[in-house]
């Protein structure tokens, strides 16, 4: 009896989507990360073209292509978040960093040397490790559970801290230091991820009750509308500051740093709200830490050494001189 009860409890605490849903969600997440990786490059290209002509980037077709790609990528992320845990989807954004760097080397003529290519390989390898070790089960699967989590004092306190930091950054720090310090705009966009990603996940959960016409569908509808409003406001502010950053800084540098900071803050918010780490063992936790570290090292190689004129030909010449 005790064993059966324990097994039942374990099954209830580790509910998750079917393997087919996980595979579909992963596929959508991978495609979305690649699409998102192209958005910053296309938008930057449009901004550069508009500056060259002396017109607004709002009139440039390439900028609009990047904006549409961003919308498509966000829709893909929304679908992925409804199928698999947040902690599995968010780190896969790493795939967009090397893809964006390769695209930028062609469209924006940004440098990508041998170390940058090695960084692309490490980012992809780290993403595979993250997929293998990420939790596949959900800890919050109903609208009632979501409401309980949203009113948790720890999560409410975290959101209040994030909101205060955003107000400080937007109204005091950004006007003075935003154009010269890339971390200001990145911090604003990343902190907003504490609202956008949980809201996206919550909308998916609330929508299930609405579509199935459950007795709590009225409450679910109200919750869904509130989360939609939060999501909409967050995306608008994010969009504004992403374009401000692209006007002032290198697109691939912004994309790389943004990935690391955004992923860290989103995983923190998701850990507090959804408790998706509760079903992760020590081995998988260490595996995810190693995967995220590998991705971060790859991103550093792509960006920090991009100005070095370093290639295989020069390595061979150096070896010949040494011999």
Curated annotation (Swiss-Prot):
Keywords: Cell membrane, Endosome, Ion transport, Magnesium, Membrane, Transmembrane, Transmembrane helix, Transport. The keyword Protease does not apply. GO terms for cellular component: early endosome; plasma membrane. Residues 1-21, 82, 133-153, 199-218, 275-284 are extracellular. The chain crosses the membrane at residues 22-42, 61-81, 83-103, 112-132, 154-174, 178-198, 219-239, 254-274, 285-305. Changing residue 100 to R: Failure to correctly traffic to the cell membrane and complete loss of Mg(2+) transport. Widely expressed. Predominantly expressed in neuronal tissues. Brain, heart, kidney, liver and colon (at protein level). It is found in: Cell membrane; Early endosome. One of its GO terms (molecular function) is magnesium ion transmembrane transporter activity. Pfam families: Mg_trans_NIPA (PF05653). GO terms for biological process: magnesium ion transport. Residues 43-60, 104-111, 175-177, 240-253, 306-323 are cytoplasmic. Coiled coil: none annotated. It is a multi-pass membrane protein. Induction: Up-regulated by low magnesium ion levels. It catalyses: Mg(2+)(in) = Mg(2+)(out). Belongs to the NIPA family. Acts as a Mg(2+) transporter. Can also transport other divalent cations such as Fe(2+), Sr(2+), Ba(2+), Zn(2+) and Co(2+) but to a much less extent than Mg(2+). Homodimer. This is Magnesium transporter NIPA1. The gene is Nipa1.
């Amino acid at each position: 009896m005790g064993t059966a009860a324990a097994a039942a409890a374990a099954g209830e605490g580790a509910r998750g989507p079917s393997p087919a849903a996980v595979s579909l969600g992963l596929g959508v997440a991978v495609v979305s990360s690649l699409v998102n990786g192209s958005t910053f490059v296309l938008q930057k290209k449009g901004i550069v073209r508009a500056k060259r002509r002396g017109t607004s980037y709002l009139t440039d077709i390439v900028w609009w292509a990047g904006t549409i790609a961003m919308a498509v990528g966000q829709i893909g992320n929304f679908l992925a978040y409804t199928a698999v845990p947040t902690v599995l989807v968010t780190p896969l954004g790493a795939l967009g960093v090397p893809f964006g760097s390769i695209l930028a080397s062609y469209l924006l003529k940004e440098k990508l040397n041998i170390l940058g290519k090695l960084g692309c390989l490490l980012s992809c390898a780290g993403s595979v490790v993250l997929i293998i070790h990420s939790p596949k089960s959900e800890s919050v699967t109903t609208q009632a559970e979501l409401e309980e989590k949203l009113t948790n004092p720890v999560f409410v306190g975290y959101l209040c801290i994030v909101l205060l930091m955003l107000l400080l950054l937007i109204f005091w720090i950004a006007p003075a230091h935003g154009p010269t310090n890339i971390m200001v705009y990145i911090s604003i966009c990343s902190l907003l991820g504490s609202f956008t990603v949980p809201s996206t996940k919550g909308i998916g959960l609330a929508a299930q009750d609405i579509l199935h016409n459950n007795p709590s569908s009225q409450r679910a509808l109200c919750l869904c509308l509130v989360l939609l409003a939060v999501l909409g406001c967050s995306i608008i502010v994010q969009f504004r500051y992403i374009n401000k950053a692209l006007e002032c800084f290198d697109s691939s540098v912004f994309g790389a740093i943004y990935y690391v900071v955004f992923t860290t803050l989103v995983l923190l918010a998701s850990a507090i709200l959804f408790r998706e780490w509760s079903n992760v063992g020590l081995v998988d936790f260490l595996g995810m830490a190693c995967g995220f570290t590998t991705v971060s090292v790859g991103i550093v190689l792509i960006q920090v050494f991009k100005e070095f004129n370093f290639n295989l030909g020069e390595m061979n010449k150096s070896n010949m001189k040494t011999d």
